[in-house]
C-alpha cells in the first residue's frame, strides 16, 4: 500500500512544470523561493514516507499547499514591479541631471554674484519726464532751430501748446481731465446724450459740440438747451466755467511751453546749431 501511494505521489507534477509552457519573465513572474524549495527538496518526500498517507487525505492536502504557493507568489511580483519602477525613476533622474548639466553653462567664465541685488528703481511719472524734457529745452545742443528774437526753439514739438494734465482711472476706462470734469459738473453730458439719441444723421456733430454756433441746426440746439436749463439749472454755469477753463489753459501753456511764442517772424532768421558748439553771435537780420 505504501509503495502504491508513493508511486501515485511521484506522478503528480510540481507547479513549475505545469507552467513551463508559459513564457516567463525573470523580472515580473519570478517563482517564489520558499515555494520552489518546498516542492523540489527531497526532505518533503522523506517526511511523506514516514507519515501515513491515505487516498482520502492526499487530494485535500495538495490543493492546500498549492493555494499557499499562489498566496505567496504575488508578493515577489509586487516587489519586482516596485524595484523596476524605482530603477526607472533613478535612471530618468540621472538622465535629466546629465541633460541639465550639459545645458547649464559652466560658472568658470562668469563672475560670481556675492551681493543681494537691491530693489529696482521705480519708473518716473509722466509729469517728471515731461519736466526734465522741458528743463533741457533751453540747451542749444538738443534743438536745431533757434529764434533770434526770443532765443527759443522753433521746432514743432517745442512750439506745440501744452494741454492741462489728465489721467485715466478705473483701469483706463474713465478719463479724468478738466474737460470731462466741466461736462459732468454742469450736466452737459446729459445734453450730449439727449442729442445723440435724437439725432438722425450719423455725420451730425451736435452731440459732440452742443454749444457751438455752427450752421448745423444752431437755433434748434440752443432752444432745446434753454428748455432743458429749466430742469437742469447747472447748465447756466457752463459758459462762465468754460471761460475760466480757457484762461487756466492759457496760463498753463505760457508756463510750460518751452518753444518760441513769437506771433510774427518778418525779420527773424532761424539758424541750425551743431551739437557741442558755443552760442553763435547775433546774425545779421534779413527779410524773408
From Swiss-Prot:
Gene Ontology annotations for the cellular component aspect, listed alphabetically: cytosol; membrane
Domain called SPR: residue spans: 154-260
Record-linked InterPro entries: Sprouty, Sprouty_domain
Keywords: Cytoplasm, Neurogenesis
Coiled coil regions, renumbered to chain: none
Biological process terms in GO annotation: animal organ development; negative regulation of ERK1 and ERK2 cascade; negative regulation of fibroblast growth factor receptor signaling pathway; negative regulation of MAPK cascade; negative regulation of neuron projection arborization; negative regulation of Ras protein signal transduction; nervous system development
Source superkingdom: Eukaryota
Induction summary: By FGF signaling. Repressed by microRNA-143-3P, which results in activation of MAPK signaling and promotion of excess accumulation of extracellular matrix. May thereby play a role in myocardial fibrosis.
Tissues in which the UniProt entry reports expression: Widely expressed; particularly in the fetal tissues. Expressed in the brain with expression the highest in Purkinje cells in the cerebellum (at protein level). Expressed in the myocardium of the heart.
PROSITE patterns registered for this protein in UniProt: SPR (PS51227)
Disulphide bridges, residue numbers: none
Annotated localization: Cytoplasm
Subunit text: Interacts with TESK1. Interacts with USP11. Interacts with CAV1 (via C-terminus).
Matching PANTHER family: PROTEIN SPROUTY HOMOLOG 3 (PTHR12365:SF9), SPROUTY (PTHR12365)
Function recorded in the entry: Inhibits neurite branching, arbor length and neurite complexity. Inhibits EGF-mediated p42/44 ERK signaling. Negatively regulates the MAPK cascade, resulting in a reduction of extracellular matrix protein accumulation. May function as an antagonist of fibroblast growth factor (FGF) pathways and may negatively modulate respiratory organogenesis.
Remaining remarks: The gene coding for this protein is located in the pseudoautosomal region 2 (PAR2) of X and Y chromosomes.
Family from the record: Belongs to the sprouty family.
Name recorded for this polypeptide: Protein sprouty homolog 3
Organism: Homo sapiens
